[in-house]
Every structure is written in C-alpha cells, then in structure tokens.
Amino acid sequence: MIFGFFSCQQPAEKQTKEMPMFCSWYTYNENEDFDSICRSFTELGIDGIVLKAGTAEEFRKTVPVAKKHGLTVYAWVWTINNHPIAAEHPEWLSYNRDGYSIADSMAYVGYYKFLSPIIPGVREGICKQVDEICKIEGIEAISIDYHRMVDVVLPTTIWPNYGIVQDREYPQWDYGYHPEMIKAFKEKHGYDPREQE
C-alpha cells in the first residue's frame, strides 16, 4: 500500500497534543451511527480518524461530528483506483498487457478500477478532488492511497484466495497499457513496451 499525507491547514504554532497519537481508519457508511462510532473511538483513547468518505459532501457532513468528539480528522482518499470519475469515463480505465480494459475484465476484486494517469482528465479529476477536500474546514491532512496500478504479482500467501499461481508476470494482471499510454511511450522511446519479453 502506498500512501502519503498532505497538509490541508496552515502550520500550527506549536504542537498541542502529546505524542504518540493514536488513529484509526474508518470508511463512512451512512447506514451506521457515525456519532456513536466517534464517541466509541474517543472512549477507546483514539485521538484521530483517517476517514474515507465517498464524496466531499460526506466529508462536510462527518467532519463536524468527529470534531465534536475531539477527533483529529485526516481524509483518506483513493486516487487512481475506484475514483468517482471512473463511472463517468470508463474509457479512461487502465488496460492490461493483453489489451483488455479493466472496465471489461476483473483484476482480483470488483473494486479494482484503476484509471490511467496519462489521460489529462484523470489528472485534473484527482487534483480537483484533493483541492475540494482540502478546503473542507476541520480536515487536517489528506492520506493518498491507491496511487498506483494493479498489483502485477500478489504476495504468495494470498494466491489461494484467488485460485491463482503467479510464478512470473502474467499479461492479464499487468496493467498500465492504455492506448494513450502506449502511444506516449512509443513517441518517447520508439517502440511498443508490449513487445518486450
């Protein structure tokens, strides 16, 4: 898992909390009592929440609730994978080495819908999403996640979960071959990367 934190607020004059700080990941679900969950986090000694919400509007709704319970809020944002623009623009999704779009095939799990960052609209959509979330009052930082492609080779311990053996790189699991990516690669390097062994 690759992730990073990007601050959304001005630097504090001095640190007010003792270290270490204890945080928990949580994916917001409108069918759950978020107020009760935040209260439980506080009772358990959790200082902060790395919150995944589907939309900026959900962050606007949940952040004040978490803050009411004294929780520091970090937005947990998936960028390349399962981004809201994927549903609007399936043609922007990544292709595997066999030439199949992840829109039409599945890579391990159904929620693996990785966008191709060569597409200007993908980059613009991610920047817009991050910018909008950073402007939400009460969010301290953003944790960027899934800012990568599909795993080419999974850890051996989970092969049985998928009924696969990956003793080498297989083209059906090797993503990042969107036609626009191939075109840009050819222009820069003079050959098609799929021709390499």
Predicted regions and their residues:
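Active-site neighborhood of glycoside hydrolase catalytic domains
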Residues: 136, 150, 165-197
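Catalytic domains of carbohydrate-active enzymes, especially glycoside hydrolases
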Residues: 28-58, 136-139
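Surface-exposed amphipathic alpha-helices with a cationic face
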Residues: 42, 60-70
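Boundary/entry segment of secreted carbohydrate-active catalytic domains
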Residues: 12-37
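Active-site-adjacent "subsite" loops/lids of carbohydrate-active enzymes
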Residues: 74-136, 154, 171, 193
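Active-site beta-loop-alpha junctions enriched in small/polar residues
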Residues: 25-29, 54, 78-82, 146-149
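Hydrophobic faces of well-ordered beta-strands that scaffold small-molecule active sites
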Residues: 20-25, 49-51, 73-77, 142-144
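Bacterial Sec-dependent N-terminal signal peptides
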Residues: 1-15
